[in-house]
């Protein structure tokens, strides 16, 4: 087997004829500044070729169903194992997909409950069993030898026969006695006495099969088993033992029934919400239905009923419902002055479904009654509008969000149903399985299933996802969470001899959780895989077996291998300047400095009683005109606080359209000092693939106008529109301004051909003849941002330069002016948005919220980012950052650390203050890692 993956002459994107040997079965980190060519090497070369070889090994029929990849532009690649790419993408938009199904843990849970689950009657809570003759034998042996008992079977009257006729038939078959009303009777005596026959109720009559005494002798046991079999046959699957003379009875059945209910025997489809055999019939396995949404009816849970928490009971006419409810509430001691969130479930039910005293009135006053009235008046337009205003996805009233039919919840293991288990956090579920004790039979049956479940749960905890629940929908996960779930699935499958390529697996991870992730990556390596990570996290880089640094800079100034080797060689070059920015930071030559002072503040926005998701009703003070960093381990409540409450609440207070914020009591403090609030996230900058960074920062408008003002353009009658590739007029109509034409091939990769009409230049020939200092519009679009700044600055085009300069300031000087926004990474999208705001001339105080802005950023780029943040603050703006990167945290003016753990054990403020104050907190995980950066 090859010891190396040998790459010769890679020329993908900006890679400059790169050749290198990557050791197999090692943990390899690929680093470099943004745009240096890391992804081109890892994904567009290694993964693309590995996937292409796999697909080409399949039949033409199979290939038509798979993604088609072009052969990378490379001389050759040798020793390449099968490649698996795990990217930062939310893989599933399917509302049925959950953490449990995507990790396959739920499939194993279904099998586990089908194999060893015990069904319990919802009436008596007794276990439902299918009996056999051994159960009857064991029951008899509970009594002392010599104890008399009788084996009976219920009298089964065949349809169309009377009781007398059935007794005659049984008499002819050799049965002499029946048991009824606690006594034995001879059948011939009953048939001879009409009065006695009429007094018998068929359901109380049992046929005597045998009378015996308890004995452990072989012949006696054989006789008992034969009689029991006969009793089951005659009783159509049921029989009874009666011990004499006490008349103590025991019932047995070969049918799965109890308390008059016939139960479904557990099977794996019974626990599948994706199967009609297991899904709740009301919501069809989604867990939600369209109905009256509690969040829309009661948007502010901090208000009481008296204060008007019920939104639909506002106004002169509808307010009468609130007044009447408050008037009646006194009789039932309903606390009308209590905030809605503080009401017990009993009182919430009264508000929604009706007061007990409503039975003394002709009409009920409740939210349900109100909407019944609205539905009854739907023929009026105003009532239809009102109904639509309060309708939304609500928890299914039948399964209460469990997704399964009620029969599935009756099956339990150690008192827990499958619905109970998927509602537990992964960490608690792992503990439950580790503490699970089964009898010998169940342990043997479940051994393999338990191993698979526990392994996968262990990996989820190890990659920092212990706070998730298995019923969490996949489409609500972040890109980082989704990537780590895919990593867990790969680990659980135990594949060996493969090449795993991961794109920044540390995204969304606190430094504490990064340590766990490193252990998982090493486990993946140790079982016989090659693990390649494209990464910037310092801890991961320091733990890699082998480091490849692509650079030295971005775009055309990158694409070279500036360092390859093990980490020992990096440290050997201590404090020595090299071409590699990564090595310079790792060996201590370069570093991100700690600010000499912190900005002071005296104004703040205050959120009172934040309790969305796992937040524990906390009061948070967010300073204005400074940089605040919100830290905490994964799942501690950072996004809930900032993105779920602060952002929508502040937008609504500023009279802007926003989603309903999460639960909180009040927004106080100096929020009126803010004029705008902006969420700078990693979503694409444009909905169209035709949008590009130059259009987003409004530089392209000025460029088009510049070309329209040229003498030749005026002579030809061209306007600014003629220099747009998105509008008719000047663009090439053959390719619609794309420069290429895509030809779909059924069994091969799509052919992307250069447009023959414009030769890839996107515009008509006469438009391209218009030049500005020998550069036409196509030449400008092919320039990088840095080249464009240099070109336009040279000829005094300050407007264009001023709009492009922020892109360079945030480290995006390497991207092309005309590069499609669909090719930008999440981190690049975020920085394009940041550049747009830096370029804005308006001075209205704005609150900027950034969600992990260091995603995809090298140490070298983080310094630029911090300068951009400082530029915004100097203009009077406020910055709040959700971040795990300690280099950013150490530059904060104020830190709010949430935790102490994720999930239910999080949601508290562990500590807050300047970085110097934070490191004194012993309970904070952030303090431990921040201290290393400050001291």
Q: Predicted regions: what is each one?
A:
Residues 1-935:
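Conserved phosphate-binding elements of NTP-dependent enzyme cores
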